[in-house]
Each structure stands twice: as structure tokens, then as C-alpha cells.
Amino acid sequence: MADISIKFPDGAVKAFPAGTTPADVAKSISISLAKKAVAAKLDGQLVDYLTPLASDGSIEIVTKDSDDGLTVLRNTTAALLRIALKKEFPAIRLGKVSADEDGFFVDTDKDDQQVSVDELDALAVIVEKLVSDKLDIERITVSKADALADAKDDQFTTALINAVDGDSVPFLKIGDYQILSDGAQLTNTGDVKKFKLLSVAGAYWQGKSSNPMLQRIYGTAFYKQADLDADLARRQEARERDHRVIGNQLDLFFVDPKVGAGLPYWMPNGATIRRTIERYIIDKEVSNGYQHVYTPVLANLDLYKQSGHWAHYREDMFPPMDMGDGEMLELRPMNCPSHIQVYNHHIRSYRELPLRIAELGMMHRYEKSGALSGLQRVREMTLNDGHTFVAPEQIQDEFKSILDLMVKVYADFDIKDYTFRLSYRDPKNTEKYFDDDEMWNNAQAMLKGAMDDLGLPYVEAEGEAAFYGPKLDVQTKTALGNEETLSTIQLDFMLPERFDLHYVGADGEEHRPVMIHRGLVSTMERFTAYLTEIYKGAFPTWLAPKQVTIIPVSEEKHGAYADKLAAELKAADIRVNVDKRGEKMGYLIRDAQTHKIPYTLVVGEDEMSNGSVSVRKYGENQTTSMSSDAFVKEILADIASYSREND
């Protein structure tokens, strides 16, 4: 049998007989590697450990302690779950299977009833039996005709089979069961170690809302119990921080199916948080030279054709509204064309630059139902949006100014866990970007120079720039572990050209400005969700929807004193309520703690007689007695403390 050439990650090349498996290759390197290995990457493609190698190629051995090793384990655990579902519910139909860095899932459909969370334990027992049986996992090929005949009563498996090219379909044979193959697999069921079936949720078939709703069973798997325990603890923490859960607990927002998915209602508590953020942002921007505007949420479709949004983002836009007289109106997906109109409303001079325009602008995006999530992914959103028009030589200074403002805003919200990413064009594929080499080279050098001057750490990402200019993304992670862009500074050389923007220079001639897109804190919806999760609902006093709750020991005896205190606090712009529900004192105090109110004041006979209050802070067990005047000073100092770092 002829030899094949196998290239290793270090560049070395070695000859092996055709038919050699990754297991053979691993053994040729070391016994210890072979013991840890579970699969391989052949020319970048994840394959089984026992896959025969038929031709030359590059190989990377995949071990248990790698992300790919976990994916292989989860592929196999998902395969065993599919068998368990068939054993427990013979008529069940099976849809998509997927495994990734967060676990795995299996989509299912039952005619009679749904798989309940209570049945997950029974399914886990079946999976554990398959593991203890230590069954070999064989990869076999079945003719497409036979596979379709066997799946005639399962429309979803039938669709998956039909999606496979060719006349044969890859299957896995595990014991007496044959199931569709999904990704690289372990060699034996006994290699599945620690797993957990987590939850059940709904998911549309193939992600399309027009398709049937299936049940998605989620799970995860690890090679070590300690890793599984740590992951389960992380998930529990994420659940406790989930803004959708906290939003319900604190009555911040809700979504009404009668109105539509992705269209949240802000309740008074949530609206108070949002209003406080908006006022803060506007004040911050105005003090930094931004001019705030209001622009229409509707615009003629021609505006978005000229900007390029209609050509490039049409799928993310709602259908145009035909006004019947040839006029087509569109809900705006972005604010930048509107701000360009503000710039273009007057002849601009170089003396006006940088011209900074900002708005809390409402936008609409045609998000699919399956992508919607609480406040993080919605169809109607209000973006903290800003656009600066600068002369080319002002780019670096303006970039520094924007970045300095961003960092100050993060400090005020106590946001610390973020990273900077500079995104450049791909130097090997420049034709897909705005065509001006000198502009790109100068702009990228200016952004990099600004970051270096400020001493801020960053990563560089070639090929991640937008078509029209380089950018800086500020990346963070949500409490659920998802990476999210918190802020962006985007240079744009294209829109000023599309809209023929000019300013009159010192030489009396017209010059083209550069446009800088800038979002400090994303949308109000997404930022509120993010803050809810990082604070775990315990908002700092300046942001808390209710800052103080006053509990009179007896409404009849002490209610008037509680009302007097509340009036004094309201006069100082402190958000306060008096709890006169008449429940037991212990219950009312616990309820205030449950709703994460920063200060709880208890007033009784002693407090009323000497003009004092008994103060309990959120998260603390002890109470402190002080005069009402002293408390007002303390809470006002607490409210003002968020901006001390920036004074």
C-alpha cells in the first residue's frame, strides 16, 4: 500500500501507510498522547480517532483537554440522548443536533405530548446505561433510499437525510441502534464521562418562525466531575443574573404576545432606570461638546437607498410603507443618514469642526423571532448614537476625545471587564473595501497611534473592519457568558462621499469631511439588560428605581411621620415610597431586600419622638439609627458618588 505524507502543526512531514488512523499517528508520537487523544483535525476538519487516512494532508491530534475534545464528547453524548429518546418514546421524531463550547442540544417532536423537564432524569438513566455498557461506536454508510424508507414517519429526519449530498448517508451504529451521524465521535460509549441534561425549551425547525415549533433538550458533558460542577455553578450564577428573570422579579419590563415579540413594555421601575441613564448620557455628551437633536423615525426609502442600507441591510429592515402616491416610507434601521441630513442643512465651515451630533434615536430592526431575547435582542430599540464630522487631520484627536469619554462613562457605571479591539481591512483582499489606500493606511495608523498614546491595551484584527473604514470595538461579556460589543468608534469615508458632504476650508475651497460613528453604551434596551446582569439587580443608589422604602411600625400611629419623611426625601429628588400594606414587619423588611431597594427606613415611637430613622442598607443585617437630616446627607452623598472618579 502506497505511503501518504502527513504534515504536523510544527511543520514536520512524515510518511505513513495509506489507511493509517489518527490513533496510529498519535501512538507514533507518544503513548501518553495516544491516551489523551479522542479525535483529530484533518486539514482543519474534525474527524473520528479511527478514521482511515487515504491521502496526503495536515493533521492535528485532538485531546480531551481541548475545546475540540469537548465537542467530540458532546457529539457522542447527544447521540446517546437521541437513542434514549427513541427507547423511551418510540414514535418521537428527531430534528437537529448540535454541540459547541456551551454544551449540546437535540430537537424533538412528539404528537401526544411534550417531553417534560421531569422526564430528563429518566432519559439520563438510559444514557448512563448505554455508557456503562461500553458499546463500540461504528461509522457505517446506508443508502439514501433505505434511510428514507426507515424514516418515512419522521419528517424532520427525512429532511436531514435529503440534505446529505450523494446516494448514501453516514450513520452511527451503537449497539442495536442506528442513528444519523452528527460530527466527530468517540470510539466507545464508555468514554462518555460526566454529563447533565439541563433543560427543555422551544425552537423552530430550521430556525424559521413559519416552521413547526419543536422541543429542544439542552445538555452538557465533561471528562471530569470537577469541570461539570464548575460549569453547573456558572450556569446557576448566570440564571440568577439573567436580566429576564430579574426584570420580572423587579417589575422592570414585559413583552406582551398580543403586541408582538421583541417589543418590550417598560414598567415604571424599568422606565425610571432608563430615564436616569438617558439623562446621564445627554448631560455627559452635552458637556463634551455634542449637540443633541431629534430626527424622524420614518424616512423616505430613497434616503436608505442613497446611504446603501437598502442594498446591504434590506433583510434586517421592515418592509417599506406604500403611502399610495408613489411615496415609500421606511422605519429607520440606523440613525446615521438622519444625522447626515442635519449636517447638510447648512453650509459648514472648518471652524465648526469637529461637529458633534448626538441623539437617543429610536430604530427598528427586522429580527427573527428565534433571535429575540428579553431586552438584549429586540425589534424596536433606542440607540445612544453620535456622529462627529471632522477634517482628516482631526481624526486622531477626536478619536482620543471619544475614547476618553467612553472610559469615563464606564467608570461611572463601574464597568471594568472590557477589552479593546482595533479592526483593520484585510491587506491581502483590499478590493472589498472602500478604494483609497492612502486613506486606509493613514486612518489605521492614527487609530493605532491614539491607542498607544493613551497607553490602552488592545488586540488587532485584520479583516474585521467595515467596508467604509477601520474601527475600534469595546468588547465585554454578559453574565450569561456571551461576548457583546459595548461600544464602537467607526471611521466612515464612504457616506460623506455618497451624500457629497463638504465643508469650506481655510483656503476658501470645499473639502470632504470624515464621519465618525460612535455609540457610548449601545441601545438603552441592551445596556439596561447588561447593567441588570452585572449588578444582579442591585443597582447602585443613583440608578435604583426605588432608592428608599419607609416602613412605619404602625400605620395608625407612625404613618403621618413616615409621610412627612417621604415628603422631605422627595423634595431632595430622592425616589421613595411608604409601605403601608400592614403586613408583619419582618415580611416587609424581607420584601424590601428581595426587591433590592438600597435603603429601608423603619420608623416607630422612638424615631418619631426624636426625629430620627432606623436605617438598614441592602445586603446588610444591622440597622443604624440617625437623624433624618443626617440620613438625607448620607444618601445624597451616595447618589453623587458615581461621578467622583471623573471630577
Curated annotation (Swiss-Prot):
Region (Catalytic) residue spans: 242-540
InterPro entries documented for this protein: aa-tRNA-synt_IIb, aa-tRNA-synth_II, aa-tRNA-synth_II/BPL/LPL, Anticodon-bd, Anticodon-bd_dom_sf, Beta-grasp_dom_sf, TGS, TGS-like
Cell compartments where the protein resides: Cytoplasm
Domain (TGS) ranges: 1-63
UniProt EC number: 6.1.1.3
GO molecular function: ATP binding; catalytic activity, acting on a protein; metal ion binding; threonine-tRNA ligase activity; transferase activity; tRNA binding
Cofactor: Zn(2+)
UniProt-annotated binding residues for Zn(2+): 336, 387, 517
Free-text remark on how the cofactor is bound: Binds 1 zinc ion per subunit.
GO cellular component, one term: cytoplasm
UniProt KW ATP-binding keyword: yes
Top EC class of this enzyme: ligase
Keywords from the UniProt entry: Aminoacyl-tRNA synthetase, ATP-binding, Cytoplasm, Ligase, Metal-binding, Nucleotide-binding, Protein biosynthesis, RNA-binding, tRNA-binding, Zinc
Signal peptide location: none
GO biological process, one term: threonyl-tRNA aminoacylation
The keyword Nucleotide-binding is assigned to this record: yes
Catalytic reaction equation(s): tRNA(Thr) + L-threonine + ATP = L-threonyl-tRNA(Thr) + AMP + diphosphate + H(+)
Record-stated family: Belongs to the class-II aminoacyl-tRNA synthetase family.
Protein role: Catalyzes the attachment of threonine to tRNA(Thr) in a two-step reaction: L-threonine is first activated by ATP to form Thr-AMP and then transferred to the acceptor end of tRNA(Thr). Also edits incorrectly charged L-seryl-tRNA(Thr).
Assembly, per entry: Homodimer.
Protein name: Threonine--tRNA ligase
